[in-house]
């Protein structure tokens, strides 16, 4: 059994900061702006916010309730209420483990760029070539990823409640301030940044279709952190008197605010300088280094920007590494420290394969079946697709079925509202879990396999 049962419960502010920190990460700062730019700007932002309300919020509530009721790991918490549905939590854990693996690779890239800015700020004349050469190299990416995982293990070695809550109370406000300062500075000094701001906030539905809608649904799962087991795990440490409904809203608001801030920094800057966003990695590691080079004080801005990414990485890893760790502890009956070392070793081992798949293992391709045929991806991209476009929405879909069929609305309402102390389960809440959320997640799953 997890040591969460004996763990001191989070304070309300501490929980909100920890939960927001777990949800906020590279998905918000790296992936959200790229998708918003390519999927219609303001149109994507508007649909994203709507889906966050329709899909993100109900599932955050549900996962928190499952975790607080179970007081254990994601898998065990689902099993406490109904043993036959334990597999839902296992799917969450497998998904998070895969995300941990490739997330660690990207985190190492972030640390490399931060260190380079601090030391020299020199990325050569061809920023794309610099990036490509670095990620395809063998030794350096592995070293930087090892440094990241070592930092995370060092902090978590002393316990999630004591370390994570204190760190998140500092990291999350600091991240918001860093992004806000960078965004305001860009609007002041970048010619044409106002046009980028208009593109970002004024909807253009001419570029919006099924692909963009599926992207928005997937991004809500990835960005808010639903389907990972994040809120089930953190819910295990929530006070029994906590207002789950209100806390879920605060987590949603904090997450969306940081995502919008990231777009506020990046999109006006890129549009104003005439740069192109061709992919997620190119956005942060190529386009932004090109942009910072042209700005007064660009090296300082680069240091602060990549520092904010490191804060996001650390705050996210504090929780997403804990999710598989708790499962390992339950299965191996080892201590917190031993299970942490085992989990971190497995994650780093997987990240080595992902990193090398961009270089010396680039020849190794894994099959990806779809209605349109079979595609082949390297290990990194395969883990990304499986976790983001299949396991995340599948986890959300099964959570809906679990609440509706296994737990039942009556028992769910008792846990969610503290037996009516914090309101009641509305007809809309029931409709969300029974119809709206399942339909939205099915759209993503069917789309990724080429059916729609």
Could you describe each region identified by the protein language model?
Residues 2-9, 165, 169-314, 318, ...:
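Membrane-embedded translocation segments of transport machinery
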Residues 3-7, 34-39, 69-91, 104-163, ...:
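Inter-helical loop and helix-membrane interface segments of multi-pass membrane transporters/permeases
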Residues 88-91, 325, 332-344, 382-441:
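C-terminal membrane-solvent junction of multi-pass transporters and transport-like membrane proteins
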Residues 8-19, 44-47, 84-97, 142-148, ...:
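Select transmembrane alpha-helical segments in multipass membrane proteins
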Residues 1-30, 59-64, 68-80, 86-87, ...:
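Membrane-interface "cap" regions at the ends of multi-pass membrane proteins
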Residues 7, 36-62, 141, 258, ...:
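Extracellular loop-to-transmembrane helix junctions
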Residues 13-51, 230, 235, 245-249, ...:
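Transmembrane helix-boundary motif of multi-pass solute transporters/channels
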């Amino acid at each position: 059994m997890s040591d969460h049962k004996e763990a001191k419960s989070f304070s309300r502010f501490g929980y909100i900061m920890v939960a927001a920190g777990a949800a906020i990460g590279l998905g918000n700062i790296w992936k959200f702006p790229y998708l918003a730019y390519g999927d219609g700007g303001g149109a994507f932002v508007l649909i994203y916010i709507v889906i966050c309300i329709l899909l993100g919020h109900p599932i955050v509530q549900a996962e928190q309730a499952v975790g607080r009721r179970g007081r254990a790991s994601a898998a065990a918490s689902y099993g406490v209420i109904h043993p036959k549905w334990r597999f839902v939590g296992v799917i969450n854990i497998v998904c998070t483990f895969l995300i941990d693996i490739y997330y660690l690779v990207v985190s190492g890239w972030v640390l490399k760029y931060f260190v380079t800015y601090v030391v020299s700020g020199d990325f050569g004349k061809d920023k794309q070539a610099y990036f490509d050469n670095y990620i395809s190299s063998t030794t350096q990416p592995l070293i930087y990823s090892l440094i990241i995982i070592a930092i995370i293990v060092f902090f978590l070695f002393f316990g999630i409640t004591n370390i994570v809550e204190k760190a998140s109370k500092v990291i999350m406000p600091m991240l918001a301030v860093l992004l806000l300062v960078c965004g305001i500075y860009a609007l002041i000094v970048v010619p044409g940044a106002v046009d980028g701001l208009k593109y970002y906030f004024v909807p253009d539905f001419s570029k919006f279709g099924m692909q963009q809608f599926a992207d928005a649904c997937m991004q809500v799962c990835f960005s808010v952190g639903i389907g990972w087991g994040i809120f089930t795990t953190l819910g295990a440490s929530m006070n029994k008197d906590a207002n789950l409904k209100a806390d879920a809203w605060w987590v949603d608001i904090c997450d969306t605010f940081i995502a919008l801030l990231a777009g506020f920094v990046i999109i006006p800057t890129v549009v104003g300088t005439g740069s192109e966003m061709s992919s997620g990695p190119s956005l942060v590691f190529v386009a932004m280094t090109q942009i910072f080079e042209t700005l007064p004080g660009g090296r300082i801005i680069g240091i602060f920007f990549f520092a904010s990414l490191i804060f996001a990485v650390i705050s996210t890893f504090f929780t997403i590494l804990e999710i598989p760790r708790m499962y390992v502890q339950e299965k191996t009956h080892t201590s917190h420290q031993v299970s942490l070392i085992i989990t971190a070793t497995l994650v780093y081992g997987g990240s080595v394969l992902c990193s090398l798949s961009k270089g010396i293992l680039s020849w190794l391709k894994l099959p990806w079946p779809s209605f349109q045929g079979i595609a082949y991806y390297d290990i990194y991209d395969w883990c990304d697709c499986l976790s983001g476009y299949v396991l995340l929405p599948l986890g959300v879909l099964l959570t809906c079925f679990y609440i509706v069929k296994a737990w039942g609305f009556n028992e769910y309402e008792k846990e969610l509202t503290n037996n009516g102390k914090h309101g009641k389960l509305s007809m809309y809440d029931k409709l969300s879990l029974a119809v709206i959320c399942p339909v939205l997640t099915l759209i993503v799953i069917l789309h990724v396999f080429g059916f729609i």
